[in-house]
Amino acid sequence: LSTIGIFSKFEMCGGSEIRCLELANAIDRYTDHTPLLLCEKGMPDKLLSYKNDEVKVVENIFLPEPINLKQLYGVDSLIIINTDCKDFSTLDYWEGRSARHTVNIDISKISQMVFLYNFIVSPSRHLHTISKKGIDVRILTTNTRFFEEIGKQDRYEMVRHLPRMILNSPINTKEVCLIKNASNKIRIGRHSIGSESKFDVENLNLIKEINKRYENDIEWDFMGVPRRDKKELKKIKNVTIRDTFSIPVPKYLQDIDIFLFFVSLKREEPWSRSVAEAMASGCPILATDKGGNKDQVINGNNGFLCKNKKSFYEAIVSLMEHKERIKEMGENSILYSKFFTSEYIVNKLVTFIDLKS
């Protein structure tokens, strides 16, 4: 059996960190390999609740002291989840010359390093410095945009020869219910963290404009909204506001018919876990026409890609006037969600890293 290490900084409890946990869970559940979660420093208690009991966590690889450094040398493949850290992709990081730590490892003892770019891809241009050490270096990108950027821009010329593949986030769909709770109204909403970048300021005006036409036919339900908008949203009688993750996501999605992913128009969403979960539950997706949303939404098929408030308005009107399309698009979402289930993703990963059982 081979051991697959998953290394990251695990400082937060966001989508990137949850991705690490679900990937480890999937390796444990669906393959003959052994996953090992390797933390630069430590792992927040909140993250541990996402972990299978059988998955082992090793803290303090580098910080505050390299107590468990040797665990790096015991893996057959090391997957580095590069969230927003620009240092992991440099040889300086692994040889203790970055601002993050001063620990110099013998990188030659790591036979394979697979770098997964989940939030930014530009640091991958430095991977040739690691590859020159005789390491088998491979690249995973979370979306098509990142993948194509490496192939097109001159700054990636030194790493373009390295094996690379698109790998979406693994989504555990086992608890997702495909049957919506009955309602005589169309329920529109979304769940996410309450960050302003995840909820465009124009959402409020969109709701008001749609309500002028369909107030008696729609219920809005948002789990996780910015403080900036809460006061005004609470004034609208057909809007429900919930705290972030106040109820389990699968349960929440049973009461959502259309998933509204109107994040800030300035935001390039890499690949949305909340959109993926909504797809698995059978929701049409209305999302901004940017970033990884283009990988998840086929315009006019399982939802709509929208460039501004006007196109979000038009998409909602289209579905309200042709309600049969909500079911049709929702069924397409379920079909496409099969390509990012945890089992599908982990088998794709294992094939790419090419380890022997």
Predicted regions and their residues:
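Conserved catalytic-core segment of nucleotide-activated headgroup transferases in glycan assembly
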Residues: 172-173, 181-235, 244
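Short hydrophobic beta-strand element within catalytic cores of glycosyltransferases
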Residues: 284-287
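A short, active-site helix/loop in glycosyltransferases that binds the activated sugar's phosphate group
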Residues: 120-161
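A short alpha->beta transition loop at the rim of the catalytic pocket in nucleotide-sugar-dependent
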Residues: 257, 282
